[in-house]
Structure formats: structure tokens, C-alpha cells
């Protein structure tokens, strides 16, 4: 979705800034326009929206500014530059496998009647850069802070570690200096436009808000506390970091070295396959069967050995967390009309090898008389009637959610690390699976079922509803002691 245009504070027509926010990635790209020229900051992989916007406004895309080598999505800088002739700009320390302008700290770029100044702000990564937008009279208006500064948080400092050379503590030290020397001295009225909001794995405790004033962040963001020492800062930003999703390093490499054109990826994924063709490819190759329909229809029945990750949830991050090989051939099962969206959203996180989709969707498979499978699914009320202290309950929520509150007898089995946790479960046992809403438990059930577990019961419903019922639960503070 796109947020409304945020016009400059003087309400004149020399500049406009639009945040283009993609909820499933919790990612913000930016369109800046002034006097017939436009710049895009941290674009997503699909380039059409930016090109269409510039064409509609009668502007030329002059620059593509990248704040760093993104790890959680594949940026659209290469395709956008190829199609528009715009110059790709990175800050210092960004060595790439393609042509770009390597800007110096303090370098100024003119865009129409405004300017954009490079502020090298290493810490999240060595090349991390913040871009300072100044208005027609040279007054600071906004910063595009990438993963250096979020609303309520800062970027995690562990993604660019180099064993024996660069530690998370080293990067956190740089981040402290970047914030104090480059960002905090700016005027309080300056707007902060980060690359991510709540839900991204690039930080720990981001706000649901996606922009703010720097002055308010100085008052509310723990990392900008004026009296915080560097030691305190390093401890705060490195404490409690979960391992990054497995696809992060691969995405960062694609952004650094280059990737296949999105048009080629979309064309390959557009291949429609009959049920017989789909089955033949599935049987003869190592293709992964990925079902992206809604969980409400998936739980009724699905193609044997298919994995569920529904488009309606945090699709791309879960794909990245659960499918370790970006080159994995993928066959799609979608709702009719959702084929292109599925291919596009996979490409956003570097999964470019979709080899086709089931023409006519799951109904075509059923109508062709093909085999189907299902996992028993129950609601919260039914679960309450079946619950006993000795049943095997897998809570697939994140460790922090589990620690905050969980069913007393549940085993923490976080979906993020299901591949690593397989040795903790016995294929002979019966397991109930539960999460916060039913989306993640359905993903987990599909993965376990594809690996031969046939005694699974998927609990659909909110954890809060489970906690409100008779089943004993434990919170971080105490046991709720229900019987």
C-alpha cells in the first residue's frame, strides 16, 4: 500500500515526498520529486510503480539512492536504472559487481530545486548511508535513514560481521558514533523516514509508526538517549538478538553483485501447467510444491507434500526463513488470478526459480481426480475439551511470544527454526500445533506432514482465546493456575 503524499512544511510546490510502504515486508521505499526530476530511495524489485508515477507526473527519474545492501529483500535498483537511465548511488564502502556512483561522505546531489546530501552512517553495515533532503533554501527537511535509525529502534549490528575481523560490538560502536555525530545534531523538525517498520527482522523493537520527527525520536527512542554511554548502547543493541533469517546473507549478496531481470523472472513463472503436467514435473524434479492460498481453504485439503505459506500473511519473510535455497525450483498452487502476485512476491526476496503454476488452481487438481491430503484442524473450543496435561503441544510462535505467555505444558517449537528443531520431535507421536492465530501453525503442520508426520492436529484460533479459557497458561510474571 502507499501512504499519502507528505508535502514540505512550507506547503509550496517545489518538492513532494511519498513513502511507498509494503506491509508484508514492513518496508518503505521513497519517491522524491522536484521541478521535473525524481529520485527513488530503496526501491522494491518491481519497477513499474515508480516508472508509472514518474510518467504520470511528467518527471524524469534521475537518481536511485541505496541506503545499504539490503538483506531482507532484493532491491529494484538494477532494473530501474536499466529502464530509466537513472544513476545508482551508494555511500562510501559499497563495493558492487555493477556500475554505480560511489558517493563521498558529504557529497551533494541536486534534484530540481532541492538537494540530497550523503551522510555516511556505518553501524548496521559498513556502507550504511543516510540521505539528508534539504529544501530550496538549503534548510534540512528530512532524512532517509535506511536501517541506521528506525522509529523507536536502530538497525541490528550483527548482519555484516566478519569472523576474526568485524564483530557485532564493533559495528554497534560505529552505529553509536554515526547517530551521535551525523544524525542527532540535525534540527528537531527534520522528518525521519526509515527503511522498515514493525515486523521487520532488521531491528528488535520497531514502532508500528513508519515516520516521525527527529525531535520526538530524541525523546522516545532508547538508542538516542542523550546520556547513554557507548558501553550502554553496545549492550542494549546487541542483547537478545535472534539469529537472522537464513535468506538474509543471500539477498545481501544479490543486491551487491547483481541479479536476473524481474521481467525474465515473471515470464518464467507465468507458465500455466495442467494437472498432469504439474504432477509430472513434481514427480520428476526436486521442485517444491508451494501452496499460497488462504489458510481457511488449505486446511480443508491440499496436494500431498505441498507446503503452505499463504499470501495473506507475512508471506515473503516466511518463505525466506523456511526455504534455505534461493535457487530451489518452485511449483505454485494459487487461487485463480493470484499467480502473478505470488511470483512477484517471491522475487522480492530472491526466489526467482518459479517454474510454473497449476492452471485452474486447486479445483482443477480435484476435478482431475488427483490425490489430496489434509491435516485434522480444530478450533480453540474443541482444543479446550481435548486438552490434557500429557498431550504433546507444539507452540510455534517466536521465543519472545512464548516467554511472555504460553500453555503450561507446551513445548516451544518456533517456526523460524523448524528445520533445526526437527530432531526434537518423534514421527511416531501425535502432536497438536498452536500459534497466535492459526497461520503459522498451518505452515508448521504442512511442513511436518510433508516430512511424514501423520498424527497432527492443527489448532486454529488466537492464543488470547486459548489463554482466556480453562487451559492452564503461564505468563512471564506468574502461572495463571487454571484447572
Predicted feature locations:
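Conserved beta-strand hairpin/beta-sheet module of binuclear metal-dependent hydrolase folds
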Residues: 14-60, 131-146, 151-152
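Core dinuclear metal-dependent hydrolase active-site scaffold
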Residues: 16-20, 30-33, 108-138, 142-143, ...
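Metallo-beta-lactamase
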Residues: 38, 125-243
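Active-site neighborhood of phospho(di)ester-bond hydrolases with catalytic His/Asp-centered motifs
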Residues: 40-41, 61-70, 89-93, 120-123, ...
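Active-site metal-binding loops of divalent metal-dependent hydrolases
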Residues: 43-44, 69, 93, 125, ...
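Active-site metal-binding motif and surrounding structural segment of the metallo-beta-lactamase
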Residues: 47-89
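Rhodanese-like catalytic fold shared by cysteine-dependent sulfurtransferases
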Residues: 156-158, 169, 216-253, 257, ...
